[in-house]
Amino acid sequence: MFEEDNYEENVKLFEKVISAQAEELLSNEDLAVIYIGRATCPFCRRFAKKLSGLTNKISTTIYYVDSADFSDNLIDSFREKYNIVTVPGFIVSKNREIEVRCDSSLSEDEILNLLK
């Protein structure tokens, strides 16, 4: 039977921020994990479900930027700066070294390895 994924339930496990807050986190935190996506994107839905399933294995907050939030005036420049041409976007900043992935097919192990 087809199991419907519930995007809103999955992203509830993340802390929602706007792009300016995400930029601040990437600049100032030793470890920052940012997920960028939207509910209407099937690839985002798949990635958010996978990422939410890892929250108990990740010892840091996952921040969520809704790419469909039209009140976020700086999201286009944020996406351009970090070369997030498609969603889902996944940004990990460790000691201000930034890695960006725009690939919903990342495995759980690949996601965890990015955080090590």
PLM regions and their residue ranges:
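Short pre-active-site segment immediately N-terminal to redox-active cysteine/selenocysteine motifs
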Residues: 37-40, 86
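Non-catalytic, surface beta->alpha helical segment in thiol-disulfide oxidoreductase systems
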Residues: 86, 91-116
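Short, well-structured hydrophobic secondary-structure segments
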Residues: 33-34, 43
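Thiol-based oxidoreductase modules, predominantly thioredoxin-like and allied folds used
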Residues: 36, 59-75
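The canonical Cys-X-X-Cys-His
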Residues: 41-44, 90
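Typically the conserved alpha-helix immediately C-terminal to a functionally engaged Cys/Sec
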Residues: 45-58
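N-terminal leader/targeting and pre-domain segments
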Residues: 1-32
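Short Fe-S-cluster ligation motifs
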Residues: 70-87
